[in-house]
Amino acid sequence: MASSRVPQQLFLQGVAAVYLFAFASLYTQIPGLYGPEGILPARRTLRPQGKGLWQQLWETPTLLWEAPRLGLDTAQGLDLLTLLGTVLALGALLLNSLRHPFVYLLLWVAYRSAYQVGQVFLYFQWDSLLLETGFLAILVAPLRGPSKHKILQGRLAGALPHEDLPFWLVRWLLFRLMFASGVVKLTSRCPTWWGLTALTYHYETQCLPTPAAWFAHHLPVWLHKLSVVATFLIEIAVPPLFFAPIRRLRLTAFYAQALLQVLIIITGNYNFFNLLTLVLTTALLDDRHLSAEPGLRCHKKMPTSWPKALLTALSLLLELTVYGLLAYGTVYYFGLEVDWQQHIILSKTTFTFHQFSQWLKTVTLPTVWLGTASLAWELLVVLWRWIQVQGWSRKFSAGIQLSVLGTATVALFLISLVPYSYVEPGTHGRLWTGAHRLFGSVEHLQLANSYGLFRRMTGVGGRPEVVLEGSYDGQHWTEIEFMYKPGNVSRPPPFLTPHQPRLDWQMWFAALGPHTHSPWFTGLVLRLLQGKEPVIRLVQSHVANYPFHERPPTYLRAQRYKYWFSKPGDQSRWWHRQWVEEFFPSVSLGDPTLETLLQQFGLKDKSPPRARSPSNGLAQTLNWVRTQLSPLEPPILLWGLFGAVVAIRVVQTLLAPRPLQSSKQTREEKRKQTSKKDSRAASEQAAANSNSRDSWAPRRKK
């Protein structure tokens, strides 16, 4: 089996990069979301209940309990955590020595601490996915850093036998994510997914589209439907190939997943989610595929024994059979036909919901057994490598580490089976009770989660959008435009990846229902009426662009509109819209309606203030850092960090010694010398044999 040391390093660097984006993006929004004058102050979530420290940390796992000991309030503690997380992630991205389990443990603890107080603004599937992936990175990271100079035939020398084992969990996580995301689209009974028309709405109605989404939206309908078919193929049929014994099948699965994620990044602003999914796909690669050495990538055709030749032929036959079955199944179940007159491909769903439910009931448990068999094989390979370890002390040390990591891997696999089985209730009930108990004991730590993206297509008939309006007299109203979400019909959609403006995202969810389903919206209205600058900066990072920057509005209200992308011929607008209804009534400070809502949602409650000193040096340092960074728009800050990483890596590459090339040349010279010696020896031997035959033949005649 091919080694995966290079993919593991790519995975660890990718996780560090995603942590970097996640921490930095969250840092820019803390004052407006969680500060004392924010929409949902974080201090409301941490109220001491007289419990011991360790019990408190276990039940509510966040380091922010310790913020008062440092003289910080909860929001400042969150500032400190996100800054430290950003610096640690930057270090892990740039330095091999910092890709250590302890560093990834600190990153996971920091993000888990922020998640605990993040409330609705951090309740996204990608936040849970980052926590689960981040925990796996703790296990994948080697205890000793890889050396750049100890590379032997593409595999790092001195590799321990168990180092590939935890990396298998990354592949299992990718399988759960993709398979569940495909299945839930059909189990939801959403008519757009079943009718293959989902993408005719998706580009227009997704939370934060990019400019490319406008162009994608105007593609032909038949191409949209064919794209939905391809999505089902990639998300449902391809994931089992992650565990295929034939590496070319796994590589095909990798490129299919990568293509899907890149297309989503181009057409939608999904922050770090698709980047994180791409990081997970590294588990499908191996050193041979990624190595730059010709000796690993290109092999001379050497004569092989007939069993190997037969095995190669059978593998090729099996590979072609799999591709044929995928093609046949796609054509059959989605009724693909070519209309030669119109030059289009027709498609339709040819199976029923009942048939799909029966199929799902049939295959879900076998996929569990597929994962079990794959893990069992990995364990056998690891045990075989351990047996081959030389030296009793090294074997004993490797055995201890193998026992710990093997137990952790099996335990995490069992834990993950419970959320995975949610896709099919029958399978959920048939799981081993021990797995349920194990999952229940650690569920609050977010070690394993259920996934299912784009379950239903919203916005059919136009995307709903909430538009805030302010007034001084209650008669003349001015729209309050957000930086990122659709508002001004003439403004093009932005490109924000990897930043996630969490208020803009929640505004999209709020528009899908009544305002009472989004209690935080009342908190937003209150802070804007009070003129709180941290919240205003969430709406407009440059306060001068906020229409009420000189004096807060006396009245606020919200209207619900429906938005559509403009037609291709309309050059002056990206959107057109239509008023639907009032979303939030006109209120002012002290208004009985507003006071009732604040009381109903608990937004008037005040927790005890955290003890802190006004002359605290740490607090002053945190305030100074924020003052320096606040003028930068969040996307610019994140892309600036990324640019700095790229620049440093380029400099590192240029200044690094290049022992590989010289060693490669040395090996090449030795090989040539050896081949010359062998050929010279062979010629001498042939001459000697010839002479001996010549001298022996006449004697035989006599």
From Swiss-Prot:
Purpose: Involved in the maturation of specific proteins in the endoplasmic reticulum. May be required for maturation and transport of active lipoprotein lipase (LPL) through the secretory pathway.
Protein name per its UniProtKB record: Lipase maturation factor 2
Parts of the chain that traverse the membrane: 10-30, 75-95, 164-184, 226-246, 259-279, 316-336, 363-383, 398-418, 636-656
Organism (species): Mus musculus (Mouse)
Domain of life: Eukaryota
Residue spans of biased composition, Low complexity class: 682-693
Coiled-coil regions listed: none
Region Disordered: start-end pairs: 660-702
Keyword terms, alphabetized: Endoplasmic reticulum, Glycoprotein, Membrane, Transmembrane, Transmembrane helix
Keyword Thylakoid: no
Name of one Pfam family that matches: LMF1
UniProt similarity note: Belongs to the lipase maturation factor family.
Glycosylated residues (UniProt): 488
Composition skew (Basic and acidic residues), residue ranges: 665-681
PANTHER family per the UniProt record, alphabetical: LIPASE MATURATION FACTOR, LIPASE MATURATION FACTOR 2
Signal peptide from the UniProt entry: none
Gene name in the database record: Lmf2
A GO biological process held by the record: protein maturation
Cellular-component GO terms for this entry: endoplasmic reticulum membrane
Topological category with respect to the lipid bilayer: Multi-pass membrane protein
Localization terms from the record: Endoplasmic reticulum membrane
